[in-house]
Amino acid sequence: MGLLNYSNKVCLAPMVRIGELPMRLLALRYGANLVWGPEIVDKALLSGTPVERVVNDRINCIDFVKPPSNKVLFRVHPLEANRLIFQLGSASPELAVEAAKLVANDVAGIDLNCGCPKHFSVHAGMGAGLLKNQDRLVSILDALVNEIGKPYKISISCKIRLLETKEDTLKLVERICDTGVRAITVHCRTTPMRNTEPADRSYLSEIVGVCRNKDVSILVNGDVLSYNDGLDVIEKYGVDGVLIARAAERNVSCFRIEGPLSSFKVAEEFLKMALEVDNNFGNTKYCLNQIMQGSFRKNVRQLAQTAKTYEDLKKAFEIEYKHSDASSVCPTLEKEKSLVISFVDLPSFLESLLASNILKQLSRLHFTKIFAVSEEEDICKQLDDIHEKFLCHGIALSLISADNLASAIASAHLVICMEKDESIMNEAVCDQKITIRLPINSNTNEAVVECENKSMQSKHALDIIQERIKDLEEKAQVV
């Protein structure tokens, strides 16, 4: 799968019962960058006869079934595999590793649950119980990093809660970082706190500082209400990403940049998705009941709540549905994209990009890599700080020379270059790439761009690029 990039990610949080396959696929369709599955305890996978991996050709999924009943404990769709984090409940390094091996080839990451406050979890030494036995917590993460993360080349992370004091929390975060995990999610509430109590972000910036010093990604959970709210939290506190739980439970279209859809529309689309992936009826009905809370069509809600079968649910929502090839219900998710940039004063131009809103636009369009063209030998040192700043936006910056130009353009979705760069222009045209050209004014030797037959100075170049990228965003929304 490859290691995950958590930067600038707005994600579906792990939720028991809610986070099954149809909800995850719907979250990704609406705009979630990563999705966590519901916690599954190691012993559920291992006790008796271990789960078996079965290819379900009828719905194009991978099922993990428990013999002899063949009950499906976990179902993965290929569309989500490289964005799916499997959350594991465990109190044992040995069992955690054994369980993780069963699913490691079909997910992008394994996340250890160290925050669930439920009695069954804490009583068994799992979830928030691990916060009181930090040596065990660290030993499980050590084992997962070394025996799963490294050999399977997937990301290992954990999700914790705040401890009673800031000092204790910071010490724990530092210990976790030292295990070699790729990311930590902090639920900004202590174990005794109810989810209705406001999240405590009073020292979140200090937690971020510890993670930055250890080169570990930091995500935050608690009171994040929408995709745009998540981006604001990322910018305000300097975290890499956020997880959304309760807001997504009520209306998973909270991941839409354009704003949420009506509860009825979401319920209707959820039902279609559940039918498409053959979701357990009881789980589908449970999730629909969460979506239908509050303002909802009374007659539909009554019929849905008394439904005994999928046929009853289809009648309640007045939909005619037949199993398809999933092309309409499970559309292909956006793949991560790259772009190539060539400019006269590259460091200055990249600094200008950082100061603009363009990186956020690129992130929304799933751009994760920028290849910057340069033949200057000493430019690497100049770009060290810039490189780190780009990573904070979820975009990796790489320098390339003319030798690597053709392959970079071949894989790129967008090329930004000066018109004088004929080799780049020709390559981009041949590969039919979307191109933003920056002609050079021979009198001033400054970069300018053409817009409606008028030349503009380089200080306006970013404005024009931004407008072009807005066009791409609008086209993406239409598609």
Curated annotation (Swiss-Prot):
<keyword id="KW-0963">Cytoplasm</keyword>
<feature type="binding site">
    <location>
        <position position="187"/>
    </location>
    <ligand>
        <name>FMN</name>
    </ligand>
</feature>
<keyword id="KW-0560">Oxidoreductase</keyword>
<dbReference type="InterPro" id="IPR052582">
    <property type="entry name" value="tRNA-DUS-like"/>
</dbReference>
<keyword id="KW-0521">NADP</keyword>
<feature type="binding site">
    <location>
        <begin position="221"/>
        <end position="223"/>
    </location>
    <ligand>
        <name>FMN</name>
    </ligand>
</feature>
<dbReference type="GO" id="GO:0005737">
    <property type="term" value="C:cytoplasm"/>
</dbReference>
<dbReference type="InterPro" id="IPR018517">
    <property type="entry name" value="tRNA_hU_synthase_CS"/>
</dbReference>
<dbReference type="InterPro" id="IPR035587">
    <property type="entry name" value="DUS-like_FMN-bd"/>
</dbReference>
<comment type="similarity">
    <text>Belongs to the Dus family. Dus2 subfamily.</text>
</comment>
<dbReference type="InterPro" id="IPR013785">
    <property type="entry name" value="Aldolase_TIM"/>
</dbReference>
<dbReference type="GO" id="GO:0017150">
    <property type="term" value="F:tRNA dihydrouridine synthase activity"/>
</dbReference>
<dbReference type="Pfam" id="PF01207">
    <property type="entry name" value="Dus"/>
</dbReference>
<feature type="binding site">
    <location>
        <begin position="14"/>
        <end position="16"/>
    </location>
    <ligand>
        <name>FMN</name>
    </ligand>
</feature>
<dbReference type="GO" id="GO:0002943">
    <property type="term" value="P:tRNA dihydrouridine synthesis"/>
</dbReference>
<keyword id="KW-0819">tRNA processing</keyword>
<protein>
    <recommendedName>
        <fullName>tRNA-dihydrouridine(20) synthase [NAD(P)+]</fullName>
        <ecNumber>1.3.1.91</ecNumber>
        <ecNumber>1.3.1.-</ecNumber>
    </recommendedName>
</protein>
<keyword id="KW-0507">mRNA processing</keyword>
<keyword id="KW-0539">Nucleus</keyword>
<dbReference type="GO" id="GO:0006397">
    <property type="term" value="P:mRNA processing"/>
</dbReference>
<dbReference type="GO" id="GO:0106414">
    <property type="term" value="F:mRNA dihydrouridine synthase activity"/>
</dbReference>
<feature type="binding site">
    <location>
        <position position="159"/>
    </location>
    <ligand>
        <name>FMN</name>
    </ligand>
</feature>
<dbReference type="GO" id="GO:0050660">
    <property type="term" value="F:flavin adenine dinucleotide binding"/>
</dbReference>
<dbReference type="GO" id="GO:0102264">
    <property type="term" value="F:tRNA-dihydrouridine20 synthase activity"/>
</dbReference>
<comment type="function">
    <text>Catalyzes the NADPH-dependent synthesis of dihydrouridine, a modified base found in the D-loop of most tRNAs. Specifically modifies U20 in cytoplasmic tRNAs. Also able to mediate dihydrouridylation of some mRNAs, thereby affecting their translation.</text>
</comment>
<feature type="binding site">
    <location>
        <begin position="245"/>
        <end position="246"/>
    </location>
    <ligand>
        <name>FMN</name>
    </ligand>
</feature>
<feature type="active site" description="Proton donor">
    <location>
        <position position="116"/>
    </location>
</feature>
<keyword id="KW-0288">FMN</keyword>
<keyword id="KW-0285">Flavoprotein</keyword>
<keyword id="KW-0520">NAD</keyword>
<feature type="binding site">
    <location>
        <position position="87"/>
    </location>
    <ligand>
        <name>FMN</name>
    </ligand>
</feature>
<dbReference type="GO" id="GO:0005634">
    <property type="term" value="C:nucleus"/>
</dbReference>
